[in-house]
Amino acid sequence: MIYIDNRQNKIKVNEELENKIKEIIDYALKEEKVNIDYEISVVFIDNNSIKEINKDYRNIDKATDVLSFPMLDYEEGKVFKDIYLNYEFDESDLDEGNLVLGDIALSLEKAEEQSKEFGHSFLRETCYLTIHSVLHLLGYDHMEEDEKVIMRQREEEILKSFNLHR
């Protein structure tokens, strides 16, 4: 189950965008071997809102593009398919039978700014940020160079499957 909640009014959100986001999340999770019913919440917000969240949770007082709030724990260097592939989840990890993977807060205002800056479509940027955040929910990180290379490779492979190129 993918929940999308539009809490901003600066960028028009239509059914096509929502459906593409849901489709790309579902595809990414299948590619990452999430073979259990799941729940992810995506909240579309503006730069002011994401700045507040970034300050509250990361102590960084500036707007960012996307924030991820994973619900599962991961050992350093491990991702979902390394730890949870055939795992028996506890009832506390489930909500109405769905594994709660976490929440995504995405600034559509920042996505639009970055799409212009990088010279590609708003759809491509929004899908990229969504994939990036989903991978964080699955334990991927980019703090170390080797982790960054792996994460970028996964992002590009998924985008390529949707014909979304830079």
UniProtKB/Swiss-Prot annotation:
This enzyme's EC code(s): 3.1.-.-
Record's GO cellular component terms: cytoplasm
Chief subcellular location: cytoplasm
Signal peptide: none
Statement: the UniProt record of this protein carries the keyword Calcium: no
GO biological process: rRNA processing
Location in or out of the cell: Cytoplasm
Keywords: Cytoplasm, Endonuclease, Hydrolase, Metal-binding, Nuclease, Ribosome biogenesis, rRNA processing, Zinc
Residues that, per the record, bind Zn(2+): H132, H136, H142
Pfam families: YbeY
Free-text remark on how the cofactor is bound: Binds 1 zinc ion.
Top EC class of this enzyme: hydrolase
One GO molecular-function entry: zinc ion binding
InterPro entries named in the record: MetalPrtase_cat_dom_sf_prd, YbeY, YbeY_CS
Cofactor field: Zn(2+)
Stated family: Belongs to the endoribonuclease YbeY family.
Chain's role: Single strand-specific metallo-endoribonuclease involved in late-stage 70S ribosome quality control and in maturation of the 3' terminus of the 16S rRNA.
The protein, known as: Endoribonuclease YbeY
Source organism: Clostridium botulinum (strain Langeland / NCTC 10281 / Type F)
